[in-house]
Amino acid sequence: MYELITQETLAEYEAFVQSHPKGNFAQSYLWGKQKPMWVWKAIAVRGDDGKIKGSLAVMIRKMPIVGRTLMYGCRGPVCDLDDRDTFGQLLAGAKALAKEYKSYVIKIDPDVPSSNTGFYNLLRSFGFDSKEGGKNFEAIQPRY
């Protein structure tokens, strides 16, 4: 089951992101503070021990004219990318936020080598479409 990060759980969340191998500054609350036109939200999933085992911070921005929002999880999620259950729970949380904020799309760009076909197959199984190739910025972030 996922949960939304609150002021009460923010320090624990930040410690998790900083210590996880897939953690990235773009998943930090502090990164969200640098983007005043965006709303920062984070989702977490806990293990049986009660500790955070996966998270996804998303930035939400209202798009002019269309009255909808764009949801972007820059360099997220932060979790074991082979853990289908955790990924699915994080995505369920993102979908709930997308509904609340009337998002027309959820974009993520985890730090995953382009050779990791297993992860890209996992993304497709959850309905994501990935941009192939591009060592520049064709796919939001470069892929190597």
Roles of regions detected by a PLM:
Residues 1-10, 124-144:
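Acyltransferase donor/substrate-recognition loop-hinge adjacent to the catalytic core
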Residues 1-29:
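Short amphipathic alpha-helix that is part of the acyltransferase structural core
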